[in-house]
């Protein structure tokens, strides 16, 4: 999908096959083992949010529309690298979209380090089952 098509889809009137009263969110889970600074976490979370939005627009546009029209809720949580990888496996088995962000290694942390995984956008209940036990960032 080109940039022009993507922008048009974001600004066009929305139609959705999903339940109108359903609530959707995007969950960003930070690799807390890396001890990143606040700015680094913000930048990596931004990368994850944008990447998840673009990926969802290409694969499940109706779900993206539902999330965009329901307020674009985002939640930032933290966990260890080991648990983050386990959550990713569970999400894939459940059909929840995931997006990995690996750092380029130009500032605080080694190149290739897994900094954050975005889960969703998906219905709140699905993500709550997966990540509800994690602590807020």
Regions found by a protein language model. Name each.
Residues 34, 81-83, 123:
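Residues that cap or initiate secondary-structure elements
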Residues 46, 51-82, 93:
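Compact, glycine-rich, soluble single-domain proteins
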Residues 40, 44, 82, 125:
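Conserved active-site and cofactor/substrate-binding residues in soluble primary-metabolism enzymes
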